[in-house]
């Protein structure tokens, strides 16, 4: 990741924290004046947004640092650890919001000062849209997983704002709409949390790349005439950075220079599919079966 990408990611992180803090204060006021359960749900969601944005900002100080003496693989996993932690916070918030909303269904309360609450929520939407548009631009330029996760939080917030506006305006006619929408928001938060949790957990435990990505690597190797077989292919992700290693089987009579050249050509092709990947290729003479734990395939 180059310096311009670093600057973009840092700038969007600062903007994210600032925007989240402003929205949090605005929604807190909206909840005080309306006593709306759906606004409370949205307020809790915003509290998590600012928490996650602050965590992201701190984590990025480490994740964007180049490899050092003690972390020679780099610091990308800090992003996965951050996203994993955020998902746990979101699970907890989804439970809290759902519990409060279900409780309100039995109490039969409805919001007050609906017009004030509506105006305030429109203001929150405007601020969120500006942030999401900038995050989309940064993701397009950098592909940052941590910014993608942050964008998901705020896109969720944008959707919940729409739901909140609808619910508080319908609550004049149907008292149960506001707490019911609070339950819907909590379920949405839970679903989003699970998606983040699943992806971050896979990266943290060094889960293999998706099968379609593995097949891309196999296809590249298979198309090179200098390779007769491949075994011990191991892959993993740390944030958006792929780590790929394998043993290539070649004619045992070719020179070391030729074997090295073939490996470089294959590594170059893989990098076209996986930019910024770290690739380790070991050359083996074809036909030697020692230390082969699993073979991906035999080319010829």
Swiss-Prot record:
The subcellular location is: Cell membrane
Mention any Pfam family matching this sequence: Cation_efflux
GO CC, alphabetical: plasma membrane
Span-the-membrane segments of this chain are: 14-34, 39-59, 87-107, 119-139, 170-190
User: What membrane topology is given?
Assistant: Multi-pass membrane protein
GO molecular function list: cadmium ion transmembrane transporter activity; ferrous iron transmembrane transporter activity; zinc efflux antiporter activity
Q: Which UniProt keywords apply?
A: Cell membrane, Membrane, Transmembrane, Transmembrane helix, Transport
UniProt superkingdom: Bacteria
InterPro entries, alphabetized: Cation_efflux, Cation_efflux_CTD, Cation_efflux_CTD_sf, Cation_efflux_TMD_sf, CDF_Transporter
Its Gene Ontology biological processes?
intracellular zinc ion homeostasis
Q: Which family does it belong to?
A: Belongs to the cation diffusion facilitator (CDF) transporter (TC 2.A.4) family.
PANTHER family in alphabetical order: CATION-EFFLUX PUMP FIEF (PTHR43840:SF41), MITOCHONDRIAL METAL TRANSPORTER 1-RELATED (PTHR43840)
State the name under which the record lists this protein.
Protein p34
What is the native source organism of this protein?
Rickettsia prowazekii (strain Madrid E)
Gene that specifies this protein? p34
């Amino acid at each position: 990741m180059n310096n311009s990408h670093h600057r973009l990611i840092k700038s969007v992180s600062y903007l994210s924290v600032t925007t989240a803090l402003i929205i949090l204060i605005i929604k807190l006021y909206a909840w005080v004046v309306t006593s709306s359960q759906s606004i409370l749900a949205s307020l809790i969601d915003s509290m998590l947004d600012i928490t996650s944005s602050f965590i992201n900002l701190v984590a990025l100080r480490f994740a964007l640092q180049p490899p050092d003496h003690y972390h020679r693989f780099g610091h990308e996993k800090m992003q996965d650890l951050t996203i994993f932690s955020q998902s746990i916070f979101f699970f907890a918030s989804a439970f809290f919001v759902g519990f409060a909303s279900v409780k309100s269904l039995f109490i039969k309360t409805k919001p007050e000062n609906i017009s004030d609450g509506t105006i305030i929520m429109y203001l929150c939407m405007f601020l969120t849209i500006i942030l999401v548009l900038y995050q989309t631009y940064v993701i397009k330029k950098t592909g940052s997983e941590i910014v993608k996760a942050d964008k998901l939080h705020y896109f969720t917030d944008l959707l919940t704002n729409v739901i909140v506006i609808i619910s508080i305006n319908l609550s004049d006619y149907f008292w149960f709409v506001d707490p019911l929408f609070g339950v819907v928001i909590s379920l949405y938060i839970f679903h989003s949390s699970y998606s983040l949790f699943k992806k971050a957990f896979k990266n943290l435990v060094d889960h293999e790349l998706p099968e379609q990505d593995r097949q891309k690597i196999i296809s590249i190797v298979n198309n090179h005439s200098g390779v007769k077989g491949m075994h011990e292919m191991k892959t993993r992700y740390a944030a958006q950075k792929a780590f790929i290693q394998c043993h290539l089987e070649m004619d045992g009579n070719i020179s070391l220079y030729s074997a090295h050249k073939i490996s470089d050509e294959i590594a170059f092709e893989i990098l076209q599919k996986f930019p910024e990947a770290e690739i380790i290729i070991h050359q083996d003479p074809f036909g030697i079966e020692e230390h082969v734990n699993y073979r991906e395939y035999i080319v010829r």
